[in-house]
């Protein structure tokens, strides 16, 4: 079958043509218009026949693949220094195909799949004439082709600036690149295999130096700073990049689609589909997933519930640039998914192995192979993309980006979130076992993305907070239902709970196994529609039986159950436990982060990490105010309501938490003996926290006020916006009616409230809304009281006068 993308048949290829070894550019980039004889022409077979002479490269395109879709994936082999992309990362991806033109030329088109219709439908003709695919290149056939093939010259196609095989215009602008320099650009090699052809090209671009201005760059002290400046371009006036383009033949018959369902979190692709029987255009959305198929003799076994091995398992290779001590943990992070695939009916469906460095027929850039690429980057992150067939969602391969500095990220998370309960976290450099464990969980998370899974930020909300402290329960069940959440580590656990790493680390868990079952269990239905109706019933049954399988989305829709970095079903309770641990950690930071000759850089970094963690807790709690629960459901579930307001008592508890932990000065963050080794203005960190919460995008957001107003119209028991604003101002301005002195922190809080409220009232987004009206009335009430306020403290008196004037000036505009 054409699916066998992982086969390792011998490559047919070679290096640069004679006279162009290694990185040596051609002596002459011009192409003669005369037809040259090519007695020295050499030829190799593969997906395309590939021929070369001293000057040019040729493809021989077999007639049987004309019209067949080919996925062209371009990656950096090596990139210029000083940019945020690295060798191995994807540059571009396009579906292309060859076809014969009426004038005899061979055309290369890009297939822009946005609309479709079956060819046996009358409407197919209308779809075809309204979806002309762009011609990327036109080739005059060359002489000497084998029978049943067309020979074309492809030198300029790859050495030039053909976008589908290179950087797009936006990326070039971000690098400030100009035109390709033909005299310093050349094809390094072309290798051809049975179902793919690999082209490696060195390209040199002219450089358009940015104008001096704000931003980073090589200006140096006192010198001009250049925004988006590329060091090589600034120093040499040109930028050289090496690309590899994999041209992979896609299956002639696309894999059967599995239609997208918002109740299970998968990445999806789609297009608009037309048919003769329609009365409205159908939007087809289908998930991205690998093709796993049983051998014919195993199909009945699988239908009976027996585990079977797929014809072609999912294999990830570990980049040989990966430090040896981390390779076993990256491999384990992949292999941990095997249990999930067993729930879907497969055994030995997925595994990882080290890259066979002694195999000359394998390339890290080859799109037949999935690789965890190790990137020498200061970026503290990792990511898991996939390359898929846009017709069906079939994942072809993935190159996971693993940044070297991700270890800094997991170190800081673990010390801040688990340092109070795990002594292993209390040092700068972790031992290999602990760091390996942390790498393993990140590996599993990123592999999940490459299997098609989206983040499930709601999974952690399915665990009651108190169970996070129950040693037996949490060590057996885990602190979050999904590795695809940003749940990190169990920061709720207290030292006296004696919870081990089994209850502290995330793991592949119930939701992940369910999601893999949904994506990968064969149903053997003939059509995507029949398959979808089957899964609709299964989803309803499973979620009713086990609410822990809920997919909560990716934290972007104002549902406080689905947030990043949170734990448990009660943000207030979880955050209170988290703060208790932060108070234990913050005093120990210097002792845990001792490094000879360090100028407090390590201490400063970890102190800032504690502040950031506290900021997350404030965000988790404030999201409940004006939030709503979102429950996706189908028509067969009439007892479920999609949008529900957060209960009033939960919102009021959230506001009380903010009053106790933010509106009142959190002195524990600054009352540490080393604070003046870090800053001469400790309260500035606290002011930043205030700015994040008391803002036009958080507590005073017009969308939040309007949601409260809308829900109050239909549910009198819900939290009314006027009640909310009264509660909020009563907390923020509690001194106003009592004549008490106001300290500097509280004065800042009050000024911030007024500034944010004025910003909202004056915004166009708030115009004509009830939220603006209520906030305007609140400001007027504050102004009236501030103008009459009395205080024996001169600073407080001046403060109230300034508040009254600020509001008055704003209202007069």
Residue ranges, per PLM feature:
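Conserved catalytic/binding loops enriched for acidic/polar residues
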Residues: 460-813
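Boundary at the C-terminal end of the N-terminal hydrophobic targeting segment
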Residues: 9-13
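Auxiliary tRNA-acceptor-end handling modules of aminoacyl-tRNA synthetases
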Residues: 14-57, 61-322, 340, 344, ...
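Stable alpha-helical elements in mature extracytoplasmic
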Residues: 326, 330-333, 435, 439, ...
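The catalytic-center signature of Zn2+-dependent metalloproteases
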Residues: 18-27, 354-375, 437-494
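Sec-exported extracytoplasmic/periplasmic mature domains
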Residues: 335-346, 448-449, 453, 489, ...
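Bacterial N-terminal signal peptides
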Residues: 1-8
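Extended catalytic-interface subdomain
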Residues: 383, 388, 394-402, 443-451, ...
